[in-house]
Design a protein with these regions (language model features):
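Helix-start (N-cap) detector for alpha-helical repeat units in TPR-like alpha-solenoids
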Residues: 25, 59-60, 93-94, 127-128, ...
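Alpha-helical segment of the N-proximal tetratricopeptide repeat
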Residues: 21-60, 67-74, 101, 105, ...
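Ankyrin-repeat and related helical/solenoid repeat scaffolds used for protein-protein interactions
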Residues: 191-266
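Structural signature of tandem alpha-helical TPR/SEL1-like repeats
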Residues: 38-50, 71-84, 94, 106-118, ...
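TPR/TPR-like alpha-solenoid repeats
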Residues: 68, 102, 136, 170, ...
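Terminal, low-structured helical/coil segments at or just beyond the last alpha-helical repeat
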Residues: 9-26, 233-283
Length: 283
């Protein structure tokens, strides 16, 4: 699961009282923000670092440093920077939210949940914090709490399809099939280009024996992302069930090649096995 990041740079988040170094630190902070605008992330990182050194109490310097480091994939360094931002300003909800998101991405679940909970306490309307909190809780197996977090995220971030998708996945896990379908359909309604949601919906319909419905969902998944191997694999399962062996061969071959190209060897082997079944049945 990919945590979402609230990524708007913050310039003047509760600035501490002016110190002699402050103008220079602010100048460096502004320089860093301008560099981010120009797409010069590495140079921006250097400017934010300098701003933070000139004034360690300048929370936005640490915060924007964290965002920039996260952009370059330096998760641990990003988490450290967000942590420094929370130390400089203990009421900085977005810093706690991003700290939690970075820790979640690094699979540090307990700590992530604690910081996300703090972000929510500081700003109960931060939808992305509720969403990431839901992800952490579901990974920790706290499903009922995760459901509540995703529902809250859906209320607060009406244009984000991810909370509805993950809610659907939990319901499916719990065997609440109709609720699962409803949540996945909601995710698709918000974002009609959501291959994972179509695929999961197709899988549920397949399990229910609605082969045409499943096939339609797998087709939509493939149309949303033509490199999404699961969509072709799912279609292959439907075609096998329908005794449409030539069609099955075609999509399973495609799925196998995509899995191979994407380095997903286990599923490439599964597709190969089904492909053999299709070939043998087609003789």
């Amino acid at each position: 699961p990919h945590p979402l990041t609230p990524s708007s740079p913050l310039l003047t988040q509760s600035l501490p009282s002016l110190k002699p170094t402050q103008p220079a630190a602010l100048e460096k902070l502004n320089q860093g923000l301008a560099l981010i605008e120009q797409g010069k992330v590495v140079e921006a990182i250097a400017a934010f670092r300098e701003a933070a050194e000139l004034n360690p109490q300048l929370a936005p310097a640490h915060y924007n440093l964290g965002l920039a480091l996260r952009q370059t994939g330096e998760l641990q360094a990003a988490a450290d920077a967000f942590y420094q931002a929370t130390q400089a300003d203990p009421n900085f909800a977005l810093a706690f939210a991003n700290l939690g998101a970075a820790l979640l991405e690094g699979n540090n679940l307990e700590q992530a949940a604690a910081y996300l909970s703090k972000a929510i306490e500081l700003d109960p309307d931060l939808g992305v914090a509720h969403y990431n909190y839901g992800l952490a809780l579901s990974e920790l197996g706290k499903l009922e709490e995760a459901i509540a977090a995703f529902q809250k995220a859906m209320q607060l971030s009406r244009n984000a399809p991810e909370p509805a998708y993950h809610l659907g996945m939990i319901y499916w896990q719990q065997g609440k099939i109709e609720e699962a379908k409803k949540s996945l359909q909601q995710a698709i309604k918000i974002s009609p280009q959501y291959p994972e949601a179509y695929y999961s919906l197709g899988s549920i319909l397949f399990e229910q024996g609605d082969l045409e419905g499943a096939l339609a969902a797998f087709r939509e998944a493939a149309q949303s992302n033509s490199n999404y191997a699961n969509a072709y694999y799912g279609a292959g399962l439907v075609f096998l069930r329908q005794n449409r062996f030539s069609d099955a061969e075609q999509v399973l071959e495609y799925a196998r090649d995509l899995y191979k190209a994407q380095g997903i060897s286990e599923w490439a082997a599964n597709a190969e096995e089904l492909l053999e079944q299709a070939r043998n049945s087609n003789r």
